[in-house]
């Protein structure tokens, strides 16, 4: 079997051998053991499930929250002749059904699934008929409430295990503290503890913390001093645009990226940066997951992340090609105050959460004992003006209410329109009195999408506009008029956040926030922030050693390239110089060192 793994690696990827602990993980999961693999960014995680998936009978199901990564990996696997597909929110019901049926009948070897899809009745019904070899859980730290990126949807993975008893799980993550490592194995119901850990040390990456009152000037100075592709991380969407404009004014090509942009715009900017058409990407933490660009020379954090896990993962996007790269954190005295304030912003007092829940019911005129299943568009700005709240507090309260089971809050809708024909294909051809724009849009829809007669289907209005030789606005009005004539069902794309009540409304004072949702998570959040502050202020210990220790990895050697190590080296040279002066071995005249002769 071991030789089979290597022959698969060579046949499909062209690599002569495995790296690091890849083979250990592959052999472990292939033998049927639940396995947790800890590998740093760029460590080759995907190989550890793709190779054994091809070596075994059945289908490997890969659970990941990263839709961009899904699409990218499926594309690359298909280019290698490997049967792969994915299920995610952008796909229509009929497309998902087709993918699942293909999987059942052998047309798919590796199936990527977003965690939100696991709970759907359709997926669970079809899953019973799929021969599963093993289940891979990517970004496994998301299942841990002690992790920095907990996602409630990940808890459903344990339910899938009950449907497929005896099927082993491979959990993978690039960021997990010892506490999170234990929690992952417990939450995924590992039959026994089984962890393989690759060193998180990045020998080609120099970690630098630089104290700077004027961070923008320091950022420009650094980018002018060190060439190559770069990512600038900031906390707010507004600042991404400001930083990109500032850099452009300085002659440094830059663009910006955040979760609020249209999908087409995000895709366009990401591709421009990946192709080096622009040098710098200014972004929030919405950018970077699943992005394959190995030659990033520098990651600069203008704003301090709220955990070392987040910092390590974002900084780790530099230098994935093994070449010398830099991770720079710009820090000053104001950052500590901002980080401390984030605790209060992220965990408002329970009384305030209850008040916001109550006012939400007034806002939508929902009576006690009603509302379950209802969805409402949510204008947070209007809500805050009426009830005199800060948006950050409202946003945090809604997330806590979501984790407590009262509602579902989506602040970043997908922004794509959906269409379904209400007439049969033959009836469409008999239609008369269609305007030229309506006729062009109907023709473009029929050419581009095969599922429009059976289900609501996501459409690309820009593509339809190109095919119909119309503007996007003309396409929109044509779709609206077709819907008014009951020819199609049309759900316009919406960027407005929405709220769905997952249970009937109760009195605000009866809202119960569980301890694990508020007290326990707040305590862990405070600990992570304190660790981040300590890292930024600790200028006596090697940066790499500090990071490795946080993730439970002991390392006696220093990196010799971070700001602390370089400062210590200068101190050592100065001490040596002073000693020689004291011992009368050298003299200093006009700042020149002159060695004394015997």
What are the functions of these language-model segments?
Residues 2-12, 16-20, 24-46, 52-57, ...:
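Helicase motor core with emphasis on the C-terminal RecA-like subdomain
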Residues 278, 295-296, 304-313, 319-598:
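C-terminal accessory region of SF2 helicases/translocases
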């Amino acid at each position: 079997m071991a030789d089979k793994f290597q022959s698969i690696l060579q046949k499909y990827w062209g690599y002569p051998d495995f790296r690091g602990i890849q083979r250990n993980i592959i052999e472990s999961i292939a033998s049927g053991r639940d396995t947790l693999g800890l590998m740093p960014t760029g460590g080759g995680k995907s190989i550890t499930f793709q190779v054994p998936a091809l070596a075994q009978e059945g289908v490997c199901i890969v659970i990941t929250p990263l839709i961009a990564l899904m699409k990218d990996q499926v594309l690359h696997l298909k280019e290698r002749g490997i049967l792969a597909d994915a299920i995610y929110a952008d796909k229509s019901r009929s497309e998902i059904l087709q993918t699942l049926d293909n999987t059942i009948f052998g047309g798919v070897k590796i199936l990527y699934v977003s965690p939100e899809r696991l709970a759907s009745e359709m997926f669970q019904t079809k899953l019973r008929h799929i021969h599963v070899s093993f289940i891979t859980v990517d970004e496994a730290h998301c299942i841990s409430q002690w992790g920095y990126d907990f996602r409630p949807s990940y808890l459903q993975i344990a339910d899938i295990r009950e449907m497929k008893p005896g099927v082993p799980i491979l959990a993978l993550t690039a960021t997990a503290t010892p506490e999170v490592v234990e929690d992952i194995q417990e939450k995924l119901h590992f039959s026994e503890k089984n962890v393989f850990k690759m060193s998180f040390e990045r020998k080609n990456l120099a970690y630098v913390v630089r104290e700077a009152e004027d961070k923008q000037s320091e950022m420009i100075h650094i980018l002018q001093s060190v060439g190559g592709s770069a990512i600038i991380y900031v906390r707010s969407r507004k600042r991404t645009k400001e930083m990109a404009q500032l850099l452009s004014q300085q002659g440094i090509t830059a663009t910006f990226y955040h979760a609020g942009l249209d999908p087409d715009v995000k895709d366009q900017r990401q591709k421009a940066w990946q192709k080096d058409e622009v040098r710098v990407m200014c972004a929030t933490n919405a950018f970077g997951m699943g992005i394959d660009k190995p030659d990033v020379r520098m990651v600069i954090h203008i704003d301090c992340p709220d955990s070392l896990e987040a910092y390590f993962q974002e900084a780790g996007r530099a230098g994935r090609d093994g070449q010398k790269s830099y991770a720079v954190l710009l820090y000053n005295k104001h950052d500590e105050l901002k980080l401390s304030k984030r605790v209060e912003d992220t965990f408002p007092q329970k009384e305030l959460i209850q008040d916001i829940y109550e006012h939400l019911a007034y806002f939508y005129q929902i009576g006690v004992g009603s509302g379950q299943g209802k969805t409402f568009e949510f204008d947070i700005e209007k809500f805050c003006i009426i009830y005199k709240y800060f948006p950050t507090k409202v946003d945090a309260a809604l997330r806590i209410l979501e984790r407590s089971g009262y509602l579902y809050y989506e602040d970043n809708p997908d922004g794509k329109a959906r269409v379904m024909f209400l007439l049969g294909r033959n009836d469409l051809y008999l239609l008369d009195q269609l305007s030229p724009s309506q006729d062009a849009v109907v023709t473009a829809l029929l050419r581009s999408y095969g599922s429009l007669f059976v289900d609501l289907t996501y459409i690309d209005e820009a593509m339809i506009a190109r095919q119909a030789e119309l503007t996007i606005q003309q396409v929109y009005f044509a779709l609206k008029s077709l819907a008014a004539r009951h020819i199609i069902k049309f759900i316009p794309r919406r960027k407005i956040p929405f709220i769905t009540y997952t249970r009937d409304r109760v009195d605000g004072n009866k809202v119960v926030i569980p301890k694990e949702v508020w007290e326990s998570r707040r305590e862990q959040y405070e600990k992570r922030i304190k660790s981040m502050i300590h890292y930024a202020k600790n200028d006596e210990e090697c940066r790499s050693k500090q990071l490795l220790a946080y993730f439970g990895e002991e390392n006696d050697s220093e990196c010799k390239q971070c700001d602390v190590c370089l400062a210590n080296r200068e101190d050592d040279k100065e001490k040596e110089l002073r000693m020689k002066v004291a011992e009368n071995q050298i003299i200093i005249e006009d700042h020149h060192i002159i060695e004394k002769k015997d």
